[in-house]
């Protein structure tokens, strides 16, 4: 049986992984081309000062995975500052810093998180994948941006174009994996998370923002 890719829409019905032949090592990824933007707001004003650097800023998009138990209490966060969980069932492949600069770069995903579902701890019930802009630039401005979810055989089984992201959104909950009756379900909250760059806020505050937003989305769905 051939396996097709799918474009997902906001608040689509959850997909059971077993029914869509996704198994083994799952992959959440993002790809985009190198994008340089002029400084905005206060940064633009400061750039006009003598000896200040007024060069455009290259977009740096970061992919993170927030792991929750059944009651939506956070038990782990995988991001560029913590590349894997204790049993290595979730692994971040590293921080790309900028988008693809060459044809060869464009053939790979700039950031990727791999998940081995059969090795996840029993306490892990929900995995929320968040894409954020390190320099607080709107995600949608990244050239040829695409978000993917799949497995090693078909890493782009599901994909979302950055064109579907709200114009001013800087951080977005893009994928949600949840245990359901012995299976795993994939959904796409497309929930705007109000975050600034990770280095400027504690991980606890970032996690609280993600948790609050996802819980609001969950209540809206049901």
Model region roles, listed by residue range:
Residues 1-222:
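Intrinsic-disorder/low-complexity signal
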């Amino acid at each position: 049986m051939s396996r097709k890719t799918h474009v997902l829409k906001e608040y689509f019905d959850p997909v059971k992984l077993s029914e869509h032949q996704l198994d083994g090592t799952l992959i959440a990824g993002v790809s985009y081309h190198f994008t340089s933007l002029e400084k905005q707001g206060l940064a633009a004003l400061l750039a006009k000062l003598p000896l200040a650097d007024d060069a455009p800023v290259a977009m740096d998009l970061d992919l993170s995975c927030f792991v929750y138990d059944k009651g939506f209490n956070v038990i782990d966060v995988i991001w560029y500052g913590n590349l894997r969980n204790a049993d290595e069932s979730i692994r971040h492949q590293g921080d790309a810093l900028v988008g693809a600069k060459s044809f060869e770069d464009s053939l790979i995903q700039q950031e990727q998180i791999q998940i081995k579902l059969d090795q996840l701890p029993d306490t892990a019930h929900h995995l929320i994948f968040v894409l954020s802009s390190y320099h607080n630039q709107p995600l949608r401005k990244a050239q040829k941006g695409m978000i993917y979810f799949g497995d090693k055989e078909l890493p782009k089984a599901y994909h979302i174009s950055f064109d579907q992201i709200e114009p001013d959104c800087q951080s977005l909950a893009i994928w949600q994996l949840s245990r359901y009756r012995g299976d795993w379900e994939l959904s796409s909250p497309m929930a705007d998370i109000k975050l600034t760059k990770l280095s400027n806020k504690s991980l606890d505050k970032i996690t609280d923002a993600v948790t609050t937003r996802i819980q609001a989305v969950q209540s809206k769905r049901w």
